[in-house]
Amino acid sequence: FPDAKIIVALRDPRDVCLSCYMQSFDLNQAMVNFLDLGSTTRLYAAVMDLWRHYRALLELDAFVYRYEDLIDDIEAMARRLLAFLGEPWDSTVLRYHEIAKKQYANTPSYQNVTLPIYRKAIGRWRSYAEQLAPHRNVLQPFLEEFGYK
């Protein structure tokens, strides 16, 4: 573990929270937090606060990127990620969706995993800005830190 390389994919916190809130998860102690936007945004903040705290405390070797930047140039981001991992470039990574179709992924978004990367979920929060507005103060520190307006 001390030499583990950590990969963190960021996404606009508003889109993350909205996506979790709108997902039909099987309820358990964690997923019950996604039944309303208030608890969803508070859980997001708690998790991201933990990440920031332990990254600094443990001096974790992390590759942090924004989903939106990946969408803009998947090959460049994949090259940077493989370099971070000390792995040679392999163009097969760009065909991840073809490989995923041959395997089972235990995720609520399985259908999306088997598709080429797409932009349609970026900025989806704008359609729900009014509903998210009461929770902006919870997300604001992360919006600023991660470069979202």
Regions found by a protein language model. Give the residues of each.
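Conserved phosphate-donor/acceptor-positioning beta-strand/loop module used by diverse small-molecule
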Residues: 2-21
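PAPS-dependent sulfotransferases, especially Golgi type II membrane carbohydrate sulfotransferases
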Residues: 17-64, 72-149
